[in-house]
Amino acid sequence: MARITAEDCNKIIPDRFRLVVLATRYAKLLNYKVETNQIKKEKRDKPPVIALRRIAAGKVSVAQLEQDLINSLRTRTMIEPLVNQDESEAVEEKFEYLPEVYIGEDYSDLDDQIFIDENGEDYETDK
């Protein structure tokens, strides 16, 4: 059987970097997704080879694969706003102990800072 090459896939996806990212994503989908009937036929090949073959043959929707990749990279964490004033004040109190440290480009501002070593003892940086 003929080997699949990047040149075959470049007809579909001209940018090699984009090809690598999309083929990797599709190979992962093949690996995790249950496509037993289709993979049994191509049983001897690994998911990256199957992905490249399908991309070269035009069996994969590149636009759908790109959208799937973008959706997988998005974060879905939602931050809930603080409604209660007491809650917001409690959160502010937790961060009051943090000292304000300003560091210049040459780090000379750290010369007079005092740090705590691993034994819990203070030491100055200019020693």
Curated annotation (Swiss-Prot):
Signal peptide: none annotated. One of its GO terms (cellular component) is DNA-directed RNA polymerase complex. Disulfide bonds: none annotated. One of its GO terms (molecular function) is DNA binding. It catalyses: RNA(n) + a ribonucleoside 5'-triphosphate = RNA(n+1) + diphosphate. The keyword Transferase applies. It comes from the Bacteria. Keywords: DNA-directed RNA polymerase, Nucleotidyltransferase, Transcription, Transferase. The keyword Nucleotidyltransferase applies. It is an enzyme of class 2 (transferase). Its EC number is 2.7.7.6. It holds the Pfam family RNA_pol_Rpb6. GO terms for biological process: DNA-templated transcription. Belongs to the RNA polymerase subunit omega family. NCBIfam families: rpoZ. The RNAP catalytic core consists of 2 alpha, 1 beta, 1 beta' and 1 omega subunit. When a sigma factor is associated with the core the holoenzyme is formed, which can initiate transcription. PANTHER family: DNA-DIRECTED RNA POLYMERASE SUBUNIT OMEGA. Promotes RNA polymerase assembly. Latches the N- and C-terminal regions of the beta' subunit thereby facilitating its interaction with the beta and alpha subunits. This is DNA-directed RNA polymerase subunit omega. It comes from Rickettsia africae (strain ESF-5).
